[in-house]
Amino acid sequence: MASIDRHSAIPLYYQLKVWFRQQIESGALRPGDQLPTEAELCDELGISRAPVRQAMAELARDGLIYRRAGAGSFVAPAAAAALIQRTTLRVQAHYDVRWMDSLEQATQRWNAQHPEHEVDLDVRMCTRSEFHQVLQRAAIRGEAPDLAAMDYVWLTHYATQGYITPLDELDARWVAQTAQDLEPPVLRNNTVEGRLYGIPIQADITGLWYRKDWFEGEGLKPPETWDAWLSVFDHFAEPEVMARYGHHYSLILPMTATTGETTTNLLIPFIWMVGADVLNAQGNLALDTHFSELCDMLRFLQTITLDRRDHMPKDVHRSNWWHLARYFAQGDVPMTLGGSYEWPRIREESNWNDETDAAAHLGFMLLPRPSRSVQPVGSLGGTSWAIFQQSEHRDLALELLKLIATRDASRQFCEENLQVSPYVSVNQRFMRAEHPWLQDLVPLLAYVRNRPMHPNYVRISGFIQDMFERVLWEGADPEAAVRKAVQALTVVMAEPY
């Protein structure tokens, strides 16, 4: 029977889908074989219906199984053979594969439109921490994949190193038309030296998730300021309130390098909201330009991570980035730092299924700030598809990206996953009453900023993570930690790239 790893970063539905696909490819499941029912899989695996239902739907969409009303799901005739007689595109992925659905749906549409030139995807996965090393080694050996999906902030490195293709090189007119509809901060993150390198799947906004239903039950408003945030934190730490809702902690947030880029992405708005920055507009080091304000901000965060540590999970320093949403989804905390990208994982780990559920029970806001006079700010994130220069199928890969970039495809993907679209025209359609969650989320895009777009960003981010870990977890003096980070970043900025 299928097995899943609940501690893996790979989404539950994807683990289940891959397992059945492998069974079909190997012949262990033959055409006509009946699959277990959704209820049976839920009972055996100990998971909710949402990931099981999604796995079955995608297997059916890919033509590997079919459903018979009242009878169940069965392996489709000649399913294994259909996987073999196709042009293969190699795809490099890390374990956060939710965006893979965009490519898989585009591949399905392509195959339906071009039965004489069908495509199959050979997806190789690695951990997020191994991702860059795997890609660079493959490129050095001349074995780079055709396609890879990567965080916006990684594109600058791969573009300046010549690993990925400027898309206007393949179809300048289509690229120009697509760029016109991209949200401005998304366009900035996908453009290097005036050329578009990535086709974005969604746009992420960082902020604070909170239990809207619990807040309303307690007569509390979402905390806009640091003082209000501490007050709400302490309220949910009161024994009688904890007994009322059954939670164990008040808040979870990343504070060590264990959560990797998530730490930088979620915490960098605190740097911005006090007037500081990592790099200035000219790309020069700027972390020490608002030194005293930066240190004051770190001291404030210490009032949470040090003074109130008993009301946070004891293993938070060892938690991986995907654990943050799990605590929240399972009702262990009323608040967690996170990104708008968390909804699919929250849905998997909870009994909430759709946009109506999200709007009724949950809230998402930009991070609390020093005072209301300070403008709210969030960090922009997202995932983009990029085509590698070594690919022998660059034109074919671009055709798939064109299908991903259609506004209908973007709308469908973002509606299903409750994500902000990278396209202005799609987001305008979400500003309607039938989208109670997205119509509140999309306006936050006006307040986002881009993380540093620098070829050495991965190393720069590593030292920012180290600074936060030393201060928030180890209790280091903020002034000493900032000075150490500035010294390290000065060396990094002087290195060639």
PLM features: residue spans?
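Hinge/lid segment of periplasmic solute-binding proteins
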Residues: 153-205, 246, 263, 361-366, ...
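Extracytoplasmic/periplasmic solute-binding protein
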Residues: 197-201, 230-286
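Conserved C-terminal helix/tail region of periplasmic/extracytoplasmic solute-binding proteins
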Residues: 216, 446-497
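Glycine-centered hinge/linker elements that transmit conformational signals in sensory
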Residues: 233-235, 282-316, 367
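Extracytoplasmic/periplasmic substrate-recognition and gating elements
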Residues: 307-309, 348-418
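Long, aromatic- and glycine/proline-rich binding clefts that accommodate carbohydrate-like moieties
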Residues: 359, 365, 414-463, 470
